[in-house]
């Protein structure tokens, strides 16, 4: 290349550089188009599969024996918050579904919009409650909490979730947008090419690391009300806390994911039998890590912690952590450094009238 620069006139050198740059832009554009085509094909295949199942259901006609028993009628919704180890956990559900005989379905919303339109809410509720062929079912996706009760359904799904320290989650998401992770390393990310560190972003007051970007876990638990997405809303945080306690079966934390999985296996073995052992000894696909991630400095963390938004998101995180640890304390015991699930700790007596 150095010899060519010596032999080529300056104008030709400039033309060569321009031609190379144009060629690279063209290649990147083609790669992007291929990715978009692949995504469209995946969605088309998924829609076709759904139509086939619905057609079979229609042709079979209404079944008189279609009533499912309690366990077979179960539906779990994991409305996963981005960058909380959600892929690691979901991969376990996929690995167990054939063995434990349930279905796993990804809720793919346009542009990952966590808020559904009213008509899509109706469709979603109808699908989940009446789609017997997909029961028992485990649904997962980046969708905010949806209250099934207001749609008049008799049996609501079981909600679960995992949340993470809000600053750690934001840092992970910041680098994920730029460098991706080891799960799909070849995929081009939206902010790819931006080498600015998280510390530099905060120091410069960048939009990708602004305190407003912390506001995500609260609205995901709050739901589809407009106030949920009003950044810094005290009402939204209170509603998120209410839903966590009253509408979620179990909410774990990323930092204690194994304990979360252990509790699910003990309480819902129909879905999670074998999950703890799989997490401990299974394939590396369960361990998804953002690449090129640099931990923020104490100064950066301190600056973010001055924000009222961080204070609210952190209060919600601490609330969830305390609740999770309370549930765990009443479900397990520690022995020689290992946790053990408690056996049944209640029984019935004084049963009347006496049978003959």
From Swiss-Prot:
Determine if Isomerase is one of this entry's keywords: no
Which Pfam families does the entry mention? Sulfotransfer_2
Q: Which residues cross the membrane?
A: 12-28
**Associated disorder, per UniProt?**
Neurofacioskeletal syndrome with or without renal agenesis: An autosomal recessive syndrome characterized by developmental delay and/or intellectual disability, corpus callosum agenesis or hypoplasia, flexion contractures, brachydactyly of hands and feet with broad fingertips and toes, and dysmorphic features such as coarse face, upslanted palpebral fissures, broad nasal tip and wide mouth. Some patients manifest unilateral or bilateral renal agenesis.
Membrane topology, as annotated:
Single-pass type II membrane protein
Query: After translation, how is this protein modified?
Result: N-glycosylated.
Entry keywords, A to Z: Coiled coil, Disease variant, Disulfide bond, Glycoprotein, Golgi apparatus, Intellectual disability, Membrane, Signal-anchor, Transferase, Transmembrane, Transmembrane helix
EC no. given is: 2.8.2.-
Q: What protein name applies here?
A: Heparan sulfate 2-O-sulfotransferase 1
State which residues carry a glycan (glycosylated). Answer: 108, 127
Mention any one GO cellular component term assigned to this protein in its UniProt record. Answer: membrane
Which stretches are Cytoplasmic in the membrane topology? 1-11
Q: Which of the seven top EC classes does this enzyme belong to?
A: transferase
Q: Write the lineage as a comma-separated list.
A: Eukaryota, Metazoa, Chordata, Craniata, Vertebrata
Any one GO biological process: gene expression
Keyword Transferase (UniProt)? yes
Which segments of the protein form a coiled coil according to its record? 24-51
What's this chain's function? Catalyzes the transfer of a sulfo group from 3'-phospho-5'-adenylyl sulfate (PAPS) to the 2-OH position of iduronic acid (IdoA) or glucuronic acid (GlcA) within the heparan sulfate (HS) chain and participates in HS biosynthesis. Required for metanephric development of kidney formation, suggesting that 2-O-sulfation within HS is essential for signaling between ureteric bud and metanephric mesenchyme.
Provide the active-site residues from the annotation. 140, 142
> Which regions face the Lumenal side of the membrane?
29-356
Q: Which GO terms describe its molecular function?
A: heparan sulfate 2-sulfotransferase activity
Q: Which residues bind adenosine 3',5'-bisphosphate?
A: 83-88, 164, 172, 279, 285, 290, 293
| Localisation | Golgi apparatus membrane
Assembly mode: Homotrimer. Interacts with the C5-epimerase GLCE.
Q: List the disulfide bonds.
A: 201-209, 222-228
